[in-house]
Amino acid sequence: EYCGESCYLIPCFTPGCYCVSRQCVNKN
């Protein structure tokens, strides 16, 4: 699900979240 942050030029700060299509998501 969406983690509430974007990641176009910066990494995801929320633990467990990763970048998919410029959005930070997790596996849930």
From Swiss-Prot:
UniProt PTM comment: This is a cyclic peptide.
Tissue specificity statement from the Swiss-Prot or TrEMBL entry: Expressed in fruit, pedicel, leaf and stem but not in root (at protein level).
Family label: Belongs to the cyclotide family.
Recorded domain comment: The presence of a 'disulfide through disulfide knot' structurally defines this protein as a knottin.
Stored InterPro entries: Cyclotide (IPR005535), Cyclotide_sf (IPR036146)
The keyword Disulfide bond is annotated on this UniProt entry: yes
This protein's UniProt keywords: Disulfide bond, Knottin, Plant defense
Cyclopeptide (Glu-Asn) crosslink site(s): E1-N28
Disulfide-bond pairs as recorded: C3-C17, C7-C19, C12-C24
Pfam families for this protein: Cyclotide
Known function: Probably participates in a plant defense mechanism.
Name of the featured protein: Chassatide C12
One GO BP annotation of this record: defense response
